[in-house]
Amino acid sequence: MPKHRKQSKIKIYRITNYKKDKRSELDSNKFELEQQAVENKQDKQGKQDNQVQSENVVIVPTDSHNLDIWDEISLKEIQAGEHTNLFAEQSNYQNINLLQVSDIRLYLDKQLQFSSVDEQIYHEALVHPIMSKVIDPKRVLILGGGDGLALREVLKYETVLHVDLVDLDGSMIDMARNVPELVSLNKSAFFDNRVNTHVCDAKEFLSSPSSLYDVIIIDFPDPATELLSTLYTSELFARIATFLTEDGAFVCQSNSPADAPLVYWSIGNTIEHAGLTVKSYHTIVPSFGTDWGFHIAANSVYVLDQIEQLYVVPTPRTLPSLLFPLFQFKEEHLEQRNFALLNSESNLILHQCYKKEMEF
C-alpha cells in the first residue's frame, strides 16, 4: 500500500465515527462500509467540498493542510488514549505500528497505511478489475503488499493455483502471519497452500528467471525518494512485462490523479514508453482524504479491450459491479496528461515531481 500521501492544499476529510454491523465481513470487528457515488459539478468546484458519505462512516472536514502531519498527530492521539498496541517494531526498513481503537490501523513511519473501515475499497480497486479481466488467472505475482490484504482479494479466485508475494520487509510478513487481528482481517491469507512468500527486493526477484504470470500486482510505496523512484522506471516496467503470459496484465498503484496528477499521469506515461498498452482508473478512499489512481497494462491491446464494460466477479463489496465509472475522469484531471513526463534510469525525475506536488 502507498506509504506517502499528499500534503494537501484542499480540505482533508477524516473518519471520525464508526458503527458496528454484525453482517459485515470487513474485519474482525465486523464493520460495514457502503461507498456512494459523489458528483460535483465543475462550475461549483471552488464552492463546495466533495462529500463522501456512507451508512456507517461519517466524514467531516478538518482544518489540517498537511495530511502527513495529520497522520502523525492522529497516531499520537491514539497512543495517548484508550487503544491496544497489536504490533510495534522498528524493522530494518521502517517503524511499524499496528493499533486497535474502534478500528484497526497500520502506520508505517507514522504514516497511515490503512484503516480497517475502508481498506477494502483500496484493495478491491487494486485487485478485482485486473483479476476479472484476465481470463482464468492461474499464476499471480504481488510486489509489495506484505500486510496480506491484496493477497486476500486474489485468493478469492478459484482459478488461482499459485501466488508469489515479494516484500522487502520480513517484519511486515511476520506481523501479517502472527497478529490475530490482522490474520482475521487478511483472512489467514499467508496460510493458504497456494501462497509463496519471498523476503527480498523486488528488483532482485525480477532479476532471476521465473515462470510467467497471468497477473502481476504492483503495490510499491509512492516515489518519495530517488531510490523509490527507481521502482517506477520504464526499464523496470519493461522488465516486469517480460514476466507476463501472452494474455497477462499488470496493475500498478499510482497515487492520486486529483492531488498528484503529474505523478499519476507520469507513471502511466512511463509504462506506455515501456511498450505497453495502458488503461487508467481511480476510486475514492475516504481515509486517504482523496481518490486514488491505478494503471493496468498489457503487452497487447486486445488483452484490455473493453475493460470499462466489464462486470466484476466475484462481486466486490465496495466497487460497482460495472467498472465503467472507475475509468471516468473529470476533464481538469484528464488535461493533466499533457504534462506527463518519462521516468527512466538515465533520467530519474519522478521523486522530484512527487516532492513538488506534496508541497503546501
Curated annotation (Swiss-Prot):
Residues where spermidine binds: H123, D147
Task of the protein: Catalyzes the irreversible transfer of a propylamine group from the amino donor S-adenosylmethioninamine (decarboxy-AdoMet) to putrescine (1,4-diaminobutane) to yield spermidine.
One Gene Ontology term of the molecular function aspect: thermospermine synthase activity
Organismal lineage: Bacteria, Bacillati, Bacillota, Bacilli, Bacillales
Top-rank taxon, per record: Bacteria
Full protein name: Polyamine aminopropyltransferase 2
Subunit text: Homodimer or homotetramer.
GO cellular component, one term: cytoplasm
InterPro entries given in the database record: PABS (IPR030374), PABS_CS (IPR030373), SAM-dependent_MTases_sf (IPR029063), Spermi_synthase (IPR001045)
